[in-house]
Amino acid sequence: MNVMQENQIKLIEHIKQAVVQAVGLPEVEVPEILLEVPKDKKHGDYSTNIAMQLARVAKKAPRQIAESIVPELKKDNKLIKEVEIAGPGFINFYLDNAYLTELVPVILTEDHKYGESDFGKGEKFQIEFVSANPTGDLHLGHARGAAIGDSLANIMKMAGFDVSREYYINDAGNQINNLVLSAEARYFEALGLESEFPEDGYRGADIISLGKDLAAKYGDKYVNTSEEERRSVFRVDALAFETGKLRADLEEFRVSFDEWFSETSLYEENKVLPALERLRENGYIYEQDGATWLRTTDFEDDKDRVLIKSDGSYTYFLPDIAYHLNKLERGFDVLIDIWGADHHGYIPRMRAAIEALGYSPNQLEVEIIQLVHLFEDGVQVKMSKRTGKSVTMRDLIEEVGLDATRYFFAMRSSDTHMNFDMSLAKSTSNDNPVYYVQYAHARISSILRSGKEQGLEVTKDADMSLLQTEAEYDLLKVLGEFADVVAEAAAKRAPHRIVRYLNDLATAFHRFYNSNKVLDMDNLEVTQARLSLIKTAQITLRNGLTLLGVSAPEKM
């Protein structure tokens, strides 16, 4: 628990005791006291509507109740500088800023751990994201999903959740058969032999490369073998080739997974039919027109869903149900699936399946990643300059840089369409959001280096009471909000709140820097205090950027 949280608890307790004294309520009957941070700091550091909550019980107007509470609040509390009543009965608090200086040694001590909390209480979450078919390059939607999924996992972990990251490899569908047939055709081609290319095959340069690899590895060994034997071998190689590419691209994007789960394993380990039988035992399966159906309309889906078609083949829905059952049986309390925009209509049926399996529908959350449109100099970009094809994640990283790509994708709520301004992302000006935040970190690093060259080291023992200016206090207030912002971003599944916070922190630092001289050799005690202060800002900027998978440069 940080200093800000401790003081909120103290303030809430003080308000509760003031209510007991002023209104005459027993402590157990005092309603939950909520503190809000006013949008305009002119209205105080905190505000509460407790007087309005008490109006019915006290049978008085809220403002009259507030007037009776305020004198009690002013008694014997060093934390409160001033209290005022606003509007119909809001009570606004102005705190004594001296408490803020207690943050500095705390942040310096916690360092990389600053921002951590036990908000999540160790609840086990699994976040499954990206999960692109292993048949080609990652596109912009995958990139946005990767950035948001990884950032969310980082944020939730810092907020005290037990988080596992998973990639579901769709390696059992027709697309894999087409991949194998494409690799086979390119294998024959690499050997100088004629081969008919599959109608729905994959024609990318990577498949040509795969065919050459197969020819180099096996020579003509599989030219005259049976199709079954050849394709069985090539399937393993093709999947290893494609998933290897995906892993490499994601690792470069600073995204890693705890588990790469193969769809094929569901069949190999006999996980699909037991899931079907569980649904049947629970009474939600019926047969009609030669097909097997799941009665999802019992759970507010708009129609029932086919699991096994009349020809005996499975729909995609059945192995998906088996996969989600497998995840829940692994002991996760909540599953978070991050899906593309084209999967929005899939949510009701999957929630229905979770409930039909006997679990709470609240154990499945789905975050939808909306579409990304690229713009450069105000013109929409649809094709890569390098390849003449659709822009891939790798293309975008090469064009604007890894940090800008990660940061920009985290800037907006995942369920909103995104116009990605490539010109802005490449800009080295304060108009570029990631540059603005990174520059604050680099500037602090530069000041700290200059201080060190003059024999000044950051210390926890500096006299922080010497921090007296409004800009110093404003910076401290923003610094103190970090753990709460992380917890809120985790609770709301909203990485963009970290982006917003980092912008606010960078702004607070720049204002402080523009109005206060940090290195003043004629006033070493104040200099020492300010060095410690900016070090805490550096730590917090770095920790926030790290949550987003963005670097915190020492120089720019």
Swiss-Prot record:
E.C. designation(s): 6.1.1.19
EC category name: ligase
Recorded catalytic activity of this chain's protein: tRNA(Arg) + L-arginine + ATP = L-arginyl-tRNA(Arg) + AMP + diphosphate
Alphabetical GO biological process terms: arginyl-tRNA aminoacylation
Pfam families: Arg_tRNA_synt_N, DALR_1, tRNA-synt_1d
GO cellular component, one term: cytoplasm
Chain location of the short sequence motif 'HIGH' region per the record: 132-142
GO molecular function: arginine-tRNA ligase activity; ATP binding
Intracellular or extracellular location(s): Cytoplasm
Keywords attached to this entry: Aminoacyl-tRNA synthetase, ATP-binding, Cytoplasm, Ligase, Nucleotide-binding, Protein biosynthesis
Superkingdom, natural source: Bacteria
Keyword Disulfide bond in annotation: no
PROSITE patterns named in the record: AA_TRNA_LIGASE_I
Matching HAMAP family: Arg_tRNA_synth
Subunit structure: Monomer.
Family label: Belongs to the class-I aminoacyl-tRNA synthetase family.
Family matches, as PANTHER family: ARGININE--TRNA LIGASE, CYTOPLASMIC, ARGINYL-TRNA SYNTHETASE
Designated name of the protein: Arginine--tRNA ligase
Annotated source species: Listeria welshimeri serovar 6b (strain ATCC 35897 / DSM 20650 / CCUG 15529 / CIP 8149 / NCTC 11857 / SLCC 5334 / V8)
